[in-house]
Amino acid sequence: MIFYTLEHILTHISFSLVSIGITIFLITLSVDEIIGLYDSSEKGVIGTFLCITGLLVTRWAYSGHFPLSNLYESLLFLSWSFAIIHMFPYLKKQKSYVRTITSSSTIFTQGLVTSGLLSEMQQSEILVPALQSQWLMMHVSMMVLGYAALLCGSLLSVALLVITFRKARKIFSKKKAFLKDSFSFVEIQYRNEPSNVLLSTSFISSKNYYRAQLIQQLDRWSSRIISLGFIFLTIGILSGAVWANEAWGSYWNWDPKETWAFITWTMFAIYLHTRTNPNFQSVNSAIVAFLGFIIIWICYFGVNLLGIGLHSYGSFNLH
């Protein structure tokens, strides 16, 4: 009972901390001068990380096994993984838009954990025979770490696509306006006000420069994080195959979870392949990452909703 109460308290504290942290961080994005607020948001995420760590340790202590046996526990570990990724730029003393993605992802997963959707899984139970193995920690932790990194990298690619397509729309609308003005007498006004034209041109050039810098930063960070996630995912799939051979006598059975894990791995392998070709980098690779983002959620949530296959012990029902 004590462990359950402690877990309940830590869950809600972590959710409150990350909620306050992301609110402060969003304020600092618009007001860069408030350094104190920025430090407070980072300390809030560190506090969230410590609370989730305490949650996992508490659950491990009273359950007797590493807490990765169902969707509720894997969501806790997913939040913990997002918090770790969030702290990398902070430890390097870099201001990065990665933290906007990771903090938002943490609050989303913690929101699911604290909601009543997974209440039937909050009570720890004895592991089914198939999960009573040392491979549980190795396989599931690598898979969830891989999911966390791939989701963060994919969201950065989505942000890149949004900025790029907004820029393309503005360029298209400006071309239409230019063609329309070419047949009018607007150029007379420009001759009378050359200084305004120069100021406007300088402002647009500066804005385009910072937008290009942002796109480049998003592209670089998404590539790095997805590469890291792909390594974790590969290790997770390989360790799962070895575990499956020990438990079921076959390395691969093509059940829904395994099939979608393979599809996820293939999609991000295609992403990494597009990164080797300069003609397919940035926007094209970001589109592949966006498709991979959708596939991850199908693999992680969609298959669990089905509740079929060899991995059905991690499924849940919506009431």
UniProtKB/Swiss-Prot annotation:
GO molecular function: heme binding
Pfam families noted in UniProt: Cytochrom_C_asm
Membrane topology field: Multi-pass membrane protein
Sorted UniProt keywords: Chloroplast, Cytochrome c-type biogenesis, Membrane, Plastid, Thylakoid, Transmembrane, Transmembrane helix
GO biological process terms held by the UniProt record: cytochrome complex assembly
Origin: domain of life: Eukaryota
Transmembrane domains' residue ranges: 9-29, 44-64, 71-91, 143-163, 225-245, 259-273, 286-306
Subcellular locations according to the entry: Plastid, Chloroplast thylakoid membrane
Thylakoid as UniProt keyword: yes
A GO CC term assigned to this protein in UniProt: plasma membrane
Principal subcellular localisation of the protein: plastid
InterPro entries: Cyt_c_assembly (IPR002541), Cyt_c_biogenesis_CcsA (IPR017562), Cyt_c_biogenesis_CcsA/CcmC (IPR045062)
Quaternary data: May interact with Ccs1.
Role summary: Required during biogenesis of c-type cytochromes (cytochrome c6 and cytochrome f) at the step of heme attachment.
Family: Belongs to the CcmF/CycK/Ccl1/NrfE/CcsA family.
Entry protein name: Cytochrome c biogenesis protein CcsA
Organism of provenance: Oenothera parviflora
Lineage per the UniProt record: Eukaryota, Viridiplantae, Streptophyta, Embryophyta, Tracheophyta
